[in-house]
């Protein structure tokens, strides 16, 4: 039998944390090396104070979307950028934000075309970088001296960075905050989930996969993670589903779905299937160059499919 979940523990706590309200807080063997050990051992017992700070900071954010993937390389960051750009363009009267919590591999500054921009600080906190008038971005990529700098951090330091993003970035009023996460179910996911589940407004997860079974195996685990953590699943996007020839429009399966693909998996796991995004080589080029694929190639089958997916995502929240 697995150990029960401890609810009252900091987001950056070790795996077997006894909880801040326990008599063993700061004294148990699991507490060794935890950045909160001294506070827990000497301070009053109670919930993580950061949770209240995050709730206050995000009180004007109506909807939060976690973009997840079980495996790397399925296009999760690309889908995050496409989803955010499309919603911002379709709803110019609304405000959108992207938070890149892939601490070790921040790619949103390049994908969204704002690589090299600087984050400014004011009395109300860090100001996110604006991609469009109604689309802003915050990423650790803006805080590095060079895009080639490596982030070599253990879990507690990553979690501290995410806490700082959620408590110190001045997002203002947002209709949607989209979080780009690393692959799998790691410290970043646990930290973001612990904070977001206590905030006001709606939240949910969009999962990204490719058709082949090796990717579907991991996205099944991601769905199980969402159910265990109480994260509403908005649905699954099947990325790179087919290749549509730009000359003759013939469809080819680059990654054959041997077991029925994402749609069949969604039926088995009882989650929504949002749709499939065809593979378009021009999209990869736009991501590398930080260009807006949606406006540059508006007639692409990928853009047409994207708008259908966006409609389903917005229906879930609205």
Swiss-Prot record:
**One Pfam family matching this protein:** ParA
Annotated region (Disordered) at: 1-29
Q: Name one GO cellular component term.
A: cytosol
The organism's superkingdom is given as Eukaryota
Q: Where does [4Fe-4S] cluster 1 bind?
A: 17, 31, 34, 40
Q: How many and how are cofactors bound here?
A: Binds 4 [4Fe-4S] clusters per heterotetramer. Contains two stable clusters in the N-termini of Nubp1 and two labile, bridging clusters between subunits of the Nubp1-Nubp2 heterotetramer.
Chain residues that bind ATP: 70-77
| Keyword annotations of the record | 4Fe-4S, ATP-binding, Cytoplasm, Iron, Iron-sulfur, Metal-binding, Nucleotide-binding
**Cofactors required:** [4Fe-4S] cluster
Broad class of where this protein is predominantly found: cytoplasm
Where do the annotations place [4Fe-4S] cluster 2 binding?
Answer: 245, 248
The protein's GO terms of the molecular function aspect are: 4 iron, 4 sulfur cluster binding; ATP binding; ATP-dependent FeS chaperone activity; iron-sulfur cluster binding; metal ion binding
Write out the function statement from the record: Component of the cytosolic iron-sulfur (Fe/S) protein assembly (CIA) machinery. Required for maturation of extramitochondrial Fe-S proteins. The Nubp1-Nubp2 heterotetramer forms a Fe-S scaffold complex, mediating the de novo assembly of an Fe-S cluster and its transfer to target apoproteins.
**Record's subunit section:** Heterotetramer of 2 Nubp1 and 2 Nubp2 chains.
Family of the protein in this entry: Belongs to the Mrp/NBP35 ATP-binding proteins family. NUBP1/NBP35 subfamily.
Name the record gives this protein: Cytosolic Fe-S cluster assembly factor Nubp1 homolog
Q: What is the lineage of its organism?
A: Eukaryota, Metazoa, Ecdysozoa, Arthropoda, Hexapoda
